[in-house]
From Swiss-Prot:
A Gene Ontology biological process term: response to bacterium
Organism of provenance: Mus musculus
Bilayer topology annotation: Single-pass type I membrane protein
Name of the protein this chain belongs to: Cell adhesion molecule CEACAM20
Processing after translation: Phosphorylated on tyrosine residues by SYK, SRC and FYN in vitro.
Length: 577
């Protein structure tokens, strides 16, 4: 571009010189001088330029170590020299230096960008001539080495590859000339390559390790080492969620879920009801997301829960886990049907059937027990059925719902009224009380009678024993000397307890004991012990039947049969009027 502009300016000067005589006439002296100078310049431009030569002190140099010196050889005078590099006008920098006449170009510190072709261009008037081309080769490198894997993913200082994939290794290092490669592999069974690339088919865990490549430049005598660490990722399999086997109770326990997997270099994600789980105050994750803790269990925390393990090449999710959270029982409800409303009072007809249902929300299912206020019987089951209502079925029925896992229980009651009962002045309870009272009174009466009878019998026996003793010692006052004829008419009495009329009592001669000393009347020994004593034994009283024979009985007899027939003691009983 510079040379083209230079030639354009020369032609402009010539055209202006040709036009000036026709448009403007200077003084004669000036015109003469101008014509003389123009003729002189024209003669000079027409003089041919000698051939140019370009030389360089060395065509091959080492970067940062050597310098390059170019020399433009020409004998022409009054010339202008321009330097051209790689077909472009050379732009000097701090590493380049020109001589005073511009014939010498020196590159003090050679860089790789200084490589290429160089020439010098000489301009003499309107004539331009170029020198020959000189090439400069700059040897450099190798630069820092980088090992690339086309099927891997960088994770920090590690490159991860999927198990079973084909992996291509490629070394990137700037160097001139082409360097030599020496590989150092983690496995001895891999043949070390001699180029900058090599391939492993179906990579496995055995191929993990450090891969090193030494790149050497034989010209610059420089070497650099490249290193890459390779990890082989397994294709992940589905994990499992582990949780405690203890019973989970609402508001009473917390639970920790663990995502169990055999893979080490994997990430873990949690899902709740198919959506990514968001941690909260009640849902907390460990540092590596391996465990999920649920604080203060609620009945809505049943899930399902899933955990997913993944790497950049594969992923797998666990089977959904649904928790069993025990709670309840909640409020107990008593109804007359499976889908009817809650009742507190029920009126039912006599002899009709009645079915009551007891229900309460509970996990596990609650246990139900029915009780009646007038009975100690306990019935199990959610349903209570009465086929025919009677009077005794009236009253309050209570249903108790209990949960054996949570240890909680609740109850509810309903009043059952039987309509159509027969009117009665007393209730069944009152009647039962009266019957029981009567039985108790009868028992008391029997006991009292037995007690009185026993007391009287004992008293009678003691009296009889006393009278018998007296009869053996004191003669009775009313012993009659009866004839045999009189003994056939009525029995003889030992004691006469019948009161006598006053006149008869006064007129009758009473037998009395003698006034002698008692020692003269009583004997110290019984008659049996002294048979020859002064006293004679008493005559034996003939035994008479209690009652005379039937047909021959005297109807006006004043004697009746005694109660105690076992005793031979009789008394006279005054007949009633």
């Amino acid at each position: 571009m510079e040379l083209a502009g230079f030639h354009c300016c020369s032609w402009t000067v010539i055209l202006l010189s040709a036009l000036l005589p026709t448009t403007w006439r200077p003084p004669a002296a000036a015109h003469f001088i101008h014509r003389a100078d123009l003729l002189s310049n024209t003669q000079m431009e027409r003089a041919p330029l000698a051939k140019l030569t370009l030389t360089v002190n060395q065509s091959t140099v080492t970067e940062q170590r050597e310098m390059a010196v170019f020399y433009c050889n020409t004998n022409a005078d009054n010339i202008t020299i321009h330097w051209v590099s790689n077909n472009s006008l050379l732009v000097l920098n701090e590493r380049m230096k020109l001589s005073a006449d511009n014939k010498t170009l020196t590159i003090l510190i050679v860089q790789r960008e200084d490589s290429g072709s160089y020439l010098c261009e000489v301009q003499h008037g309107f004539e331009v001539q170029r020198s020959n081309t000189a090439s400069l080769t700059v040897n450099y490198g190798p630069d820092p080495v980088s090992i690339k894997l086309d099927s891997g993913v960088a994770a920090g200082d590690v490159v991860e590859v999927m198990e079973g994939n084909t992996v291509n290794f490629r070394v990137e290092a700037q160097s001139s000339p082409v360097p030599a490669y020496a590989w150092y592999l983690p496995s001895d069974f891999i043949q070390p390559p001699t180029t900058g690339t090599f391939t492993i088919d179906a990579v496995s865990r055995e191929h993990e390790g450090m891969y090193r490549c030494l790149v050497s430049n034989p010209v610059t005598n420089l070497s650099r080492l490249g290193v890459v660490k390779v990890q082989v990722l397994e294709k992940v399999t589905a994990p499992n969620i582990e949780f405690p086997t203890l019973a989970l109770v609402e508001n009473a326990t917390s639970v920790t879920l663990t995502c169990k997997t055999s893979h080490q270099r994997v990430g873990v994600h949690w899902f709740l009801k198919g959506q990514p789980l968001r941690p909260s105050d009640r849902l907390t994750l460990s540092s590596q997301n391996r465990t999920l803790t649920i604080h203060g269990l609620q009945r809505d925390d049943i899930g399902p829960y899933e955990c997913e393990v993944w790497n950049w090449g594969s992923q797998a999710r666990s089977v959904p886990l649904k928790l069993t959270i025990n709670y309840g029982p909640d409020q107990v409800e008593i109804t007359q049907g499976p889908a009817s409303g809650v009742v507190s009072t029920i009126e039912a007809m006599l002899n009709s059937s009645l079915t009551l249902y007891c229900r309460a929300d509970s996990i596990p299912g609650a246990r139900y027990q029915w009780t009646h206020e007038h009975s100690s019987k306990v019935l199990d089951g959610e349903q209570l059925s009465i086929e025919a209502l009677r009077q005794e079925h009236q009253g309050i029925y209570s249903c108790t719902s209990s949960n054996d896992v949570t240890g909680l229980a609740r109850s509810a009651s309903v009043l059952v009224m039987v309509v159509g009962l027969q009117s009665s002045s007393m209730s069944p309870g009152a009647i039962a009380g009266i019957v029981i009272g009567i039985l108790v009174a009868i028992a008391l009466a029997i006991g009292l009678g037995y007690f009185l009878y026993s007391t009287k019998d004992r008293w009678t026996r003691r009296r009889s024993a006393s009278d018998t003793t007296s009869s053996n010692t004191i003669p009775p006052t009313s012993v009659m000397q009866s004839t045999p004829e009189s003994r056939h008419n009525k029995p003889m009495t030992v004691y006469d307890n019948t009161p006598k009329p006053e006149g008869e009592a006064r007129g009758k001669k009473m037998w009395s004991l003698p006034r002698d000393s008692p020692e003269q009347f009583y004997e110290k020994k019984p008659p049996s012990a002294a048979p020859e004593g002064p006293r004679k034994p008493l005559p034996q009283i003939p035994k008479q039947p209690l009652m005379p024979p039937g047909p021959g009985r005297n109807e006006e007899s004043n004697y009746e049969k005694l109660l105690n027939s076992n005793h031979s003691l009789y008394c006279k009983i005054t007949p009633s009027a």
